[in-house]
């Protein structure tokens, strides 16, 4: 296996037994592909597919005027270049977006043309600006108003038809009432439902119900047609002396004989007996075609058609009439030879439609349409046209109704049709098919659907949601355009004047800015970013709501297997509604989730990979990834554990059709990062995967010594580390940028063969954590494409590194680890292991006020010199200044209104000048509880406002950086060109040149070194071909110089132009503070197995328990946290971590003892090739082996993949190899007494995380502060600088102690007794420590509320 540049430096030992058939796919594919398909920016304008923006335009255009003589057609669209790049947008608080321009064609037809023919009179084409469309960054996020946001995919109910029942809840009898619902992608919902009396009703858009036959009549069906569609018939002939019924023996089975069945005077079935299959066979054998039936048998049956007296033409009976004795007499009298009755029975041919027709009062199509109109538009008088229009618009016009391709596919599959394509609207056959299927289900043939099945729920990603929003915007525009089109011809308008793009832009802006699914990106660490982009939510517009979602929707469904993670979901009200995509899952063209499987043929597992959606998966038998295979890939066991039709069963190898691709297939990225996940209880695994997302990046990242092997993928795909775009050699490196000279074979002609990577330095993330990148390469290193060049936050040598590997001991320690508390050693704090940097952004805005402009300056009234010492002459703090609470960061003065002055003030003003008093100090100060270092200052100035000195300095520095980048590109390109020129010229005959080069002289290197490089192009050669090549090179160099100039000009223009600020803002200063947070008691820590706790105490190193060799442990955890929580994974991690660390120390000792390289190789071979996947180190040079050993000193990283990890024996073998006790336990000594503890203690290394719940952010105290306006009580919470609530239960406590005076004080002067607290303040100032309590304000509020109920309440004072 080939290792990348960083992988070589530190190889993980992998305990996985199963080969990796399929690499983990790029983790952000869903987001990127969806939006790419929406924009189709990379496709030419005439080659776009009918999806995304293109489809949205095509559905709304052409817009035709009311008269039909003018139409506006859509031709194509194009996206411009964004003005600012991603980083600039973040700094300036702008949206990263590209202008959208649409080419429209206005076609005017001749009004006077003869009817039926259209003559084009005029065509105008014009490009119209349609607002800006936000672009997705390469990491799958959007920058909206300067903040990074993610649009979460939505899991919603797929369009199509669904059959269900009410689970017996509607009616008290517990009878199951079946229903069918047709859900379109857009348009009205159509529901059919049974009532307890077995009639079928229809609802449109959940309005009041109508008999279902009303809808059928509205479609133009007559009673007879309806009956013929839904029922089979029996034919009855009227004979001289009775009635003969055509006999279909199959229909008799299971019925009770109402009369004696006679065959040739032999009674086959007696009256009152049930007809069995034997009787049916006998009847069939007898070959009887008809039976004589008594009249009583026919009474109560229903006629299938209208019966007309042929002689007189008189209507004898209507279709669906019930047969009575009178009717039979009438029929006989009218001379009717035969008639048909509906065949129904109570088992599987219910009379539902017939009973529905009986309650249906409509008799004609028009009546039915009017009835539907009344239901949809109550209170409006119906007309024939209105009723017809409304009905046709409901389900039969493309503008109002669309099933979508998915909906049509699901619809056709469900009603049992072969083809899966068709129109987006419904037709008569569709509605009949739904009704027939519903009746079949009611008759007991067929199953209801499971709406939580992932074949009935689909994923709506960014692109699709953006398209819908865009379409909505366009529809709003359409209405306005239609009205203006009528005047377009007379006034000679152009498309530009017809279209107002504001509604479109507003709809798009609203969606990206404030939709429920457009979320502020969780940027705590790279894992939380990746997870956020892979999240799938059932909430949001068109989805569920928290309150209405029941248990079933939230539950894990068998179809989640390999598609949605069963573990990772939030705790709390959203549990189960927000899920994460499984590692290998992807969405198909229809939006259903698919997961990959290996094909199995005749018991042999192939490497052919097939993606199956939940719909297809049910019909196959699928083996699990851990099924035993022999060397040839045949399934070995006689019975293999597998899944079929959503059930877990056992099956023989020959029946198996597919096999899982990997054991980690079923979990999400976060869960796949938990080692020994298979040994943890699911609830704790859920907490573990959620808490990894809250880990704060530490100052020095340290990758987990026990990992799962997926860490590198996550780190690279998250985009937090920098990956080489093309291979090459490192030309220069410093902390802020890396310059790579690209390999010749990877550059295209004419482009500079240089890649410059600017590193992100100390930037603030959305969660105020610090994003910082550090280079990993040195000058001269050879890189390949995809190698990691720089680590980001929480990555270490290109691997995810969320926390620190700590030496832990499981033992109680003086009660300081009671209830999950965590005891840590002072050494951890001293070594800054869990120190993190947090960056706060503070903003100062200078506005234009009524009294004059606010000013940013260092000239602030009544402020001491010492407070101004950190400001420069512009009044802005220096970068690098260390600031404390209440220090001034930006000096700002605001004009103050004129006030009446006392004579003394007038005198002072006369003596000391005006300035002091007409402005007040409104400077930006450091908030309380925050101290740190200023790391960056940004000044934004409105156009037309002079820039101050500081702004110009910042601008100059930015320009210098741009210039440096461009110069480096040019330098490398020049070097490359001159190298090629030298190769071209040396050794060839010249025809003349600078420095008196003679004709016929051979050009030498010496000659070229004497001539300045710029003059090499003046050399003329004998061969014309060489001269041509020289000219080409000279031209391309000139071209690059020009390109350099233009790019520099562009950048300069961008930097020097004024900023786009909010109205009324003249200047804005942003100051960034870096705050160092050390570990302290009260901070929350956690492992990766849901084992969380709060730091209770930091203990001096000398008091911590220590090992026999004197090593003190770092952390002491409570052993009682393991048994009841059932997360044993943490113990196994601890054991393996100890082995890994021990092996690293052993390698370190060997290196220090200057062991031979061969010995090192042998030892490494023992470690890596002990079991499972082999690592071949023979290709490594000695130097690489030494580098590897140096990196392994801190511990040999291990990977134990989920569900395929290290086994107990392997852990023991590793401990043995590291010369550690195989039990994983050792004797510890008490640091305070030096005595050994009674029993051996489990000790080892665990990867611990510091979570973003820091005591500094939560601790809060109030002396005086704001009060609520109505109740006059102090506000609550840290954000409002509120007080501590002395609540109901606290009052009980004081009452219980009888502390009446303390209680009175709490409820009055310390809370909301306004007079009392003012009086008390006065008393304290006067040194008089008495208090008088008055009526608290909240009592007055209560009195007012009671009075508002018209109950008078008064306070009588004695």
UniProtKB/Swiss-Prot annotation:
Reaction catalysed by this enzyme: RNA(n) + a ribonucleoside 5'-triphosphate = RNA(n+1) + diphosphate
InterPro entries attached to this UniProt entry: DNA-dir_RNA_pol_bsu_ext_1_sf, DNA-dir_RNA_pol_bsu_external_1, DNA-dir_RNA_pol_su2, DNA-dir_RNAP_su2_dom, DNA-dir_RNAP_su2_hyb_sf, RNA_pol_bsu_bac, RNA_pol_bsu_CS, RNA_pol_bsu_protrusion
Keyword entries, A-Z: DNA-directed RNA polymerase, Nucleotidyltransferase, Transcription, Transferase
Gene Ontology cellular component terms for the protein in this record: DNA-directed RNA polymerase complex
UniProt cross-references to SUPFAM superfamilies, sorted A to Z: beta and beta-prime subunits of DNA dependent RNA-polymerase
Pfam families: RNA_pol_Rpb2_1 (PF04563), RNA_pol_Rpb2_2 (PF04561), RNA_pol_Rpb2_3 (PF04565), RNA_pol_Rpb2_45 (PF10385), RNA_pol_Rpb2_6 (PF00562), RNA_pol_Rpb2_7 (PF04560)
Gene Ontology terms for molecular function: DNA binding; DNA-directed RNA polymerase activity; ribonucleoside binding
Biological-process GO terms, alphabetical: DNA-templated transcription
Highest taxon above the source species: Bacteria
EC number(s) on file: 2.7.7.6
Enzyme class per UniProt: transferase
Family recorded in the similarity comment: Belongs to the RNA polymerase beta chain family.
Role of this protein: DNA-dependent RNA polymerase catalyzes the transcription of DNA into RNA using the four ribonucleoside triphosphates as substrates.
Assembly description: The RNAP catalytic core consists of 2 alpha, 1 beta, 1 beta' and 1 omega subunit. When a sigma factor is associated with the core the holoenzyme is formed, which can initiate transcription.
Cross-referenced PANTHER family: DNA-DIRECTED RNA POLYMERASE I SUBUNIT 2 (PTHR20856)
Identification of the protein by name: DNA-directed RNA polymerase subunit beta
Originating organism: Thioalkalivibrio sulfidiphilus (strain HL-EbGR7)
